[in-house]
Amino acid sequence: MVKRSNSYESRAEIVSSAKRLFQQYGYKKTTVSDIAKAMGKVKSAIYYYFPDKESLLRAVIDEEIGKLIRSIKDAVERASTPEEKLRVYALTRSFEIRRLSTEYARFQEEYDQLFPLVKEIHERYDHFERDTLKGILEVGMELGHFNKTDSEVLADTILLWLKGLEAQLSSFGSEEALKEAVEHLVNVLLFGIKVR
């Protein structure tokens, strides 16, 4: 049992070190040797847990996506009404995506190289987003807060809006400006579907 714990801690330490270096130097410029050196270990210690640098990047991205999902779930669970759930979903998602795009700014320069991996991970995350939004919408419809409509189509539409906003994150100079834009977007959405 102790060995498993040490194994988990070693793996987590490697992922944490890789994350720091990927953020600082980008994926392309970070080597497995750099990661090992930053930890005071040899390369073979990294390869014991990860067969290559890409699998290490996958672990880093999976960890970040896990944090993103937990943040969104926690925020949505704390909200009491379907309207508030939509609002906190959109705000939390936008702030977390902004945080990630800032922390991993160097990845934008390497996007073409990383596209296949990013696309695969994005597709998994899209399922979570679609299911979460669909659930919020369906509860809102059942409670009579939202007009009855195709929740799947509406969830996809909301995601398109949020992704459009996501593409423009760098144009918002402050978190307050981003919050205001998200609030406007949610208000347009709510007053378009809210039962009067």
Placement of each model-derived feature along the sequence:
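C-terminal peripheral helix-coil segments that are non-catalytic and often amphipathic
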Residues: 1, 95, 131-142, 156-161, ...
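N-terminal intrinsically disordered/low-complexity leader segments
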Residues: 1-9
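Helix-turn-helix
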Residues: 2, 13, 17, 21-55, ...
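Hydrophobic alpha-helical connector segments
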Residues: 59, 63, 70-99, 155-158
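Amphipathic, non-transmembrane alpha-helical scaffold segments
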Residues: 15, 57, 61, 65, ...
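Short coil/turn segments at alpha/beta junctions that flank glycine-rich nucleotide-binding fingerprints
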Residues: 24-28, 79, 100, 143-144
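Secondary-structure edge/capping motif, primarily at the C-terminal ends of alpha-helices
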Residues: 75, 104, 108-111, 169-172
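Short secondary-structure transition hinges
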Residues: 94-134, 142-143
